[in-house]
A protein has these predicted regions:
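Short, small-residue-biased leader/transition segments that mark boundaries at the very start
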Residues: 1-4
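Short hydrophobic segments within beta-strands
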Residues: 8-10, 89
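FMN-binding flavodoxin-like domain, especially the glycine-rich phosphate-binding loop
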Residues: 15-18, 22-39, 45, 49-144
């Protein structure tokens, strides 16, 4: 099986990175090894053989994924997402989470099993509730 459960994220202000670290903490707490990596330092090839992984990205612009690095990465993942269990998470500063609903729809349409059928989102920096939700997401990933 997988040695590492990977969380790949893009973060501008550090909020989504904090969420990624909480997901990683949940994986570690469940007795598995976590790899929390910035999207700029990972290739989609590293996820192809994984049964489960998490992706994190904040809402950008008009409720879209970050277009320079994360969007192309997610587009590649769509090509092999069928049958994978994927956790999604990210922070937002405005709006109501439409970017995440769109992202969940994309991954589901590609055949992925999105954990809990929705992403973990929080406004601005993750509060205790958001950290707990991310940690729980990590525990779920570790069990796959």
């Amino acid at each position: 099986g997988d040695v590492y459960k990977r969380q790949v994220y893009w973060s501008q202000s550090g909020n989504t990175q904090a969420m990624a670290e909480a997901v990683g903490a949940g994986i570690t707490a469940a007795g598995k090894e976590a790899a929390v990596v910035d999207v700029s330092s990972v290739s989609t090839a590293e996820l192809k053989n994984a049964k489960a992984f998490a992706l994190g990205c904040p809402a950008m612009g008009a409720e879209v994924l970050e277009e320079g690095e994360m969007e192309p990465f997610v587009t590649e993942v769509e090509g092999f997402a069928a049958g994978k269990t994927i956790g999604l998470f990210g922070s937002y500063g405005w709006g109501d989470g439409q970017w995440m609903r769109d992202w969940v729809d994309r991954m589901s349409s590609a055949g992925a099993n999105v954990l809990n059928g929705e992403g973990v989102i929080c406004k601005e920096a993750p509060d205790d509730e958001a950290v707990a939700a991310c940690t729980d997401l990590g525990r779920q990933l570790a069990a796959v």
